[in-house]
C-alpha cells in the first residue's frame, strides 16, 4: 500500500501527480492500515465500541475521531488533516467529508439513513455478484440485504466479478435492470462511481449477465489472496 503524502494536495504514492516531487510523508503503510481498519469499523459497524456517536445519516465529527486515535500509543501526531487526507485519497472511495463531519458511504452493517446520497447518474444496468448455486433462488425471490443494511450493486460487470472473487473462485454475475427499477419507483442511490445502493431488487429486474473476460491486476490478485486467507483463518 503506497504511503500517504502531501505536496500540491494529498496523494498516495512516491511522487506528486502535479510536479513529480516526493512531497511530505503524512502516513506510512502501517499507519494507513491501522487508521483505515479502525475508521471502517467505527463508521460502518460499531461506533459505540469506540465511544463515537453517529447521526442518523452516519456522520461523525472528525475532531472526535482524531481525539480517539490520539489516545492510542504512538499516535499523538494525528490531526484532522491526516484523517481528511486519508479519506480523500482512499482508493475504495469509502468516505464522504461534509465540513467537520465524515461518514462511510457503503458497507454498513448498522442501520444508517443513506437516502441523502445522489440519485442521478445511475447506469441503466447494474450488476450483482452471486454464484451458480445461489442464482436460481435470487432470480425467483429477488435480492434483499443480508450481512449489510443495504444491497450493494456494482456499476460494471468487472467490478462485480472481482468483488465476488474475494469470496468464491467462480462468481456468477447477475444483471439488474436499474432503469426499469427507477421508472417503477424503486430508489437507487449512488455511493460512488462503482457502488450503488438499494433496499430491494425484485426478481423481475434480474437476469444472468452476459459473461465478460476479466483479467486481474497483480494488486487485485494479492489483495484477494490476502483477504481470503484472512477469512479462512476465522473458520
Curated annotation (Swiss-Prot):
A biological process (GO) annotation for this entry? tRNA splicing, via endonucleolytic cleavage and ligation
Transmembrane segments annotated in the record for this chain? none
Domain of life from the UniProt record: Archaea
Q: What keywords would UniProt list here?
A: NAD, Transferase
The EC number(s) attached to this protein equal 2.7.1.-
Could you confirm whether the keyword NAD appears in this record? yes
Q: Does the keyword Transferase apply?
A: yes
Q: Which residues form a coiled coil?
A: none
Which InterPro entries does this one have? Ptrans_KptA/Tpt1, RNA_2'-PTrans_C, RNA_2'-PTrans_KptA, RNA_2'-PTrans_N
Q: Which GO terms describe its molecular function?
A: NAD+ poly-ADP-ribosyltransferase activity; tRNA 2'-phosphotransferase activity
For this protein, the record's Pfam families field holds: PTS_2-RNA
**According to the UniProt record, what class of enzyme is this?**
transferase
Family, per the entry?
A: Belongs to the KptA/TPT1 family.
The entry's function note states: Removes the 2'-phosphate from RNA via an intermediate in which the phosphate is ADP-ribosylated by NAD followed by a presumed transesterification to release the RNA and generate ADP-ribose 1''-2''-cyclic phosphate (APPR>P). May function as an ADP-ribosylase.
Q: What is this protein called?
A: Probable RNA 2'-phosphotransferase
Naturally occurring in which organism (per UniProt): Thermoplasma volcanium (strain ATCC 51530 / DSM 4299 / JCM 9571 / NBRC 15438 / GSS1)
Tell me what gene encodes this.
Answer: kptA
Amino acid at each position: 500500500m503506497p504511503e500517504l503524502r502531501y505536496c500540491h494536495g494529498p496523494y498516495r504514492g512516491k511522487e506528486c501527480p502535479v510536479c513529480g516531487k516526493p512531497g511530505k510523508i503524512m502516513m506510512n503503510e502501517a499507519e494507513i492500515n491501522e487508521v483505515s481498519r479502525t475508521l471502517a469499523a467505527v463508521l460502518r459497524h460499531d461506533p459505540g465500541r469506540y465511544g463515537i456517536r453517529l447521526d442518523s445519516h452516519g456522520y461523525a465529527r472528525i475532531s472526535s475521531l482524531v481525539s480517539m486515535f490520539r489516545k492510542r500509543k504512538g499516535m499523538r501526531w494525528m490531526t484532522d488533516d491526516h484523517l481528511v487526507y486519508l479519506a480523500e485519497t482512499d482508493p475504495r472511495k469509502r468516505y464522504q467529508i461534509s465540513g467537520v463531519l465524515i461518514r462511510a458511504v457503503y458497507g454498513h452493517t448498522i442501520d444508517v439513513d443513506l437516502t441523502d446520497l445522489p440519485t442521478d447518474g445511475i447506469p441503466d444496468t447494474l450488476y450483482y455478484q452471486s454464484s451458480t448455486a445461489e442464482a436460481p433462488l435470487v432470480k425467483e425471490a429477488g435480492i434483499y440485504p443480508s450481512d449489510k443494511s443495504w444491497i450493494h450493486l456494482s456499476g460494471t460487470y468487472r467490478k462485480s466479478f472481482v468483488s465476488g472473487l474475494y469470496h468464491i473462485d467462480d462468481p456468477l454475475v447477475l444483471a439488474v435492470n436499474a432503469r426499469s427499477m427507477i421508472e417503477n419507483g424503486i430508489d437507487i442511490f449512488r455511493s460512488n462511481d462503482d457502488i450503488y445502493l438499494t433496499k430491494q431488487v425484485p426478481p423481475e429486474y434480474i437476469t444472468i449477465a452476459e459473461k465478460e473476460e476479466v483479467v486481474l491486476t497483480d494488486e487485485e490478485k494479492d489483495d484477494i489472496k490476502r483477504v481470503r486467507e484472512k477469512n479462512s483463518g476465522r473458520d
